[in-house]
């Protein structure tokens, strides 16, 4: 069950995951939650009724799915958190990137692009998403001791990129001399750049994002976005598919998975 296919990268994840799983002999049922947490809960319950072996979740709201995951576990179904950790749910596996490193790379790019320093905004993703906290940590730790100052922060709840419009407009009123904007992903960056363009600031304010979306790469060529942290989505999706199929076949987490991460209540 996928948060939404509005974000380009989830389409790429889906295509690679489905192709890999089918090559391994698995049947795959993909559901689009349409950016609706309640719909995603309904989809998980549907999968439970269909007696799926494994449910892979790209969470809409990382804090809203723990009871649904508990129902899946009670039915003997394994659950994987894919790139967004389901909080307080004790999912069987969490597979993602090194999100702290993503934040570090974004900060390093900012320092490179703004050598004279100045004010920057952080327009991040959902506050309930553990990845957002990790990216923020890496970003802020890297900026410590630099001449860049974070003067405005906001979170786009539910990863709703359109919320960035009001945030940036508000921030620009107070800090019109902003030098850079860190965006939670390229979808958010697209909204931020739209506001900058309306204020004749596109290309003058450094904008960084992540995901390597095609549109972001085009904006980099145009000069309105400075960088996007590229992540090998294909590798992540293939690996997740292999683990999901193996989990379905063996009924347990693969023995080569040894690292743990805390989801708020469980390791």
Can you name each region flagged by the protein language model?
Residues 48, 110-115, 172, 240, ...:
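Short, hydrophobic alpha-helical segments
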Residues 45-49, 54-73, 139, 152, ...:
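Hydrophobic alpha-helical
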Residues 1-15, 29-39, 60-61, 84, ...:
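Hinge/beta->alpha junction and helix N-cap segments in small-molecule ligand-binding domains
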């Amino acid at each position: 069950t996928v948060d939404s296919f509005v974000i380009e990268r989830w389409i790429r994840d889906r295509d690679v995951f489905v192709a890999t799983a089918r090559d391994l002999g698995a049947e795959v049922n993909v559901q689009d939650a349409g950016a609706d947490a309640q719909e995603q809960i309904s989809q998980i319950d549907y999968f439970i009724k269909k007696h799926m072996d494994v449910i892979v979740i790209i969470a809409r709201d990382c804090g809203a799915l723990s009871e649904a995951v508990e129902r899946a576990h009670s039915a003997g179904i394994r659950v994987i958190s894919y790139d967004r950790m389901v909080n307080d749910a004790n999912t069987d596996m969490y597979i993602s990137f090194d999100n702290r490193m993503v934040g570090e790379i974004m900060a390093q790019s900012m320092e490179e692009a703004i050598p004279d320093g100045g004010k920057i905004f952080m327009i991040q993703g959902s506050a309930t998403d553990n990845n957002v906290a990790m990216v923020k940590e890496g970003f802020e730790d890297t900026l410590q001791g630099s001449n860049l100052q974070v003067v405005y922060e906001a979170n786009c709840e539910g990863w709703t990129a359109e919320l960035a419009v009001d945030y940036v407009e508000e921030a620009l009123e107070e800090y019109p001399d902003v030098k850079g904007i860190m965006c939670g992903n390229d979808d958010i960056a697209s909204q931020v750049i739209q506001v900058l363009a309306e204020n004749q600031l596109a290309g003058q304010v450094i904008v960084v994002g992540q995901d390597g979306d095609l549109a972001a790469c085009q904006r980099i060529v145009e000069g309105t976005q400075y960088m996007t942290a590229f992540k090998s989505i294909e590798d992540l999706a293939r690996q997740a598919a292999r683990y999901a199929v193996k989990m379905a076949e063996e009924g347990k987490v693969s023995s080569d998975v040894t690292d743990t991460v805390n989801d708020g209540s469980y390791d």
